[in-house]
Amino acid sequence: MSDNDDIEVESDEEQPRFQSAADKRAHHNALERKRRDHIKDSFHSLRDSVPSLQGEKASRAQILDKATEYIQYMRRKNHTHQQDIDDLKRQNALLEQQVRALEKARSSAQLQANYPAADSSLYTNPKGSTISAFDGGSDSSSDSEPDEPQSRKKLRMEAS
C-alpha cells in the first residue's frame, strides 16, 4: 500500500502535453506537498491515538516508539484478558456440571421420598450387603475401604 492510495490527485497524464518545465515543476511540487501533508496528518492522528502522547508535541520517531510500546502493551493486556475469559469459561463449565449433579441428586432424593424403601427396592450386592435401588448399583460395602474423594481442580481467581 503506498502513501498515495488515500490521496486523490490528478496524474501527469491528464495534463495537456504542451506544459512548460515550470508548470511541470509546480505541479510536481503541489503533489509532493499533498503527500507530505497527508503523512503529517497521519502522524498527528497516530499521536492522538496513543494515550501517553495525546496533545503533546513529539517527533515522528517518538510517535513511532510510543505507538509501538502501546501496541505491545495492548497485546499483553489482551492476552491476559483472554486467559481470564478462558479461566472463567472453565469455572462456568465446572459450576454447570455441579448444578446438573445437584439437580440429579435432588430428583433422586424426591424419588426416594415418593417410594420409601420396601423389600422390592432393596437388593443384595455380590458381597452380600443390602443396597437400595437408588444407590446407582455400587458394588461397594461399608466394610470396604472408603472411596477417595474426587479431587476438583480449583481455578485461580484473580481480581481484575
Curated annotation (Swiss-Prot):
Residues 1-40, 105-160 are annotated as: Disordered. One of its GO terms (molecular function) is DNA binding. Residues 1-13 have a biased composition (Acidic residues). Residues 81-102 are annotated as: Leucine-zipper. One of its GO terms (biological process) is positive regulation of transcription by RNA polymerase II. SUPFAM superfamilies: HLH, helix-loop-helix DNA-binding domain (SSF47459). Residues 29-40 have a biased composition (Basic and acidic residues). This is Protein max. It comes from Gallus gallus.
